[in-house]
Amino acid sequence: IDNEVFIVEKDGVAVIIESPCFFDNNQELAEYLQDLEIAGMLVAYHGAGATFMPEVAKYATANAVAYSQSGGGKALIDNFSNAFGASFDSSVHQITHIIGEGPITIGGIEFIIRQTADAFDIEIPQINAVYTHMLGHDCHSIVAGPAHADAIIAQLQGYITQGYDLILTSHYTPEDLKDAATKIAYLEELKKLAAHSANAEDFKAAVNRQYPDYSGANYLEMTAGFFFA
């Protein structure tokens, strides 16, 4: 799996967004960062990997803590632990600072926290960027039913309205607002295809016909399970 970690640096001080979760990556990234002062880590959707920089202050919303400790994030951690075995660091970061919606400054860098259903997104005004969990303009996403699709659409439309130059995600290369518009169209189409499908298998077949070149078949499998639970 591709898990992205972002390092926002200003004047020799850095803030980490998300944590790596494989032991070898934990060590490699810690070595890479050894000459920087790390002011803190924002732990949103990827709570595993607690052996990575355990001494650094950890920031998260209350719902993100619940997501990683007992919610959908915990279920994913358990699944990854079973799939990857001893190479996967399933320990969950202990959050030292519970944060809420709105602006917060860490290490001299301003962030704006936007709470989502599972955890939170992070706006970074100084570089006109936003971090969210998943986008992927040519990749399936995990969509937990029509209401979740609508929530993602509203979220992405908000980013388009705000005019962000860069959208950073955990599972894809950096993208832009054209990619957000593409994902909105995809989500609208998913809802239509689900409404006209008799079951999960029909739905997956219809989506694959519409988007034959999309990656992330495992995400589509999960989405089908949510739409036809």
PLM segments and residue spans:
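Active-site metal-binding motif and surrounding structural segment of the metallo-beta-lactamase
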Residues: 13, 23-65, 162
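Conserved beta-strand hairpin/beta-sheet module of binuclear metal-dependent hydrolase folds
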Residues: 1-33, 120-134
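Structural recognition of the beta-strand scaffold that forms the well-ordered cores
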Residues: 7, 15-17, 41-44, 59-60, ...
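Accessory terminal helices/loops
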Residues: 161-166, 173-229
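Active-site environment of divalent metal-dependent phosphoester hydrolases
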Residues: 2, 23-25, 45-52, 65-68, ...
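Metallo-beta-lactamase
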Residues: 21-22, 67-184, 188-190
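Soluble non-cytosolic domains of exported or imported proteins
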Residues: 20-27, 98, 146-150, 197-198
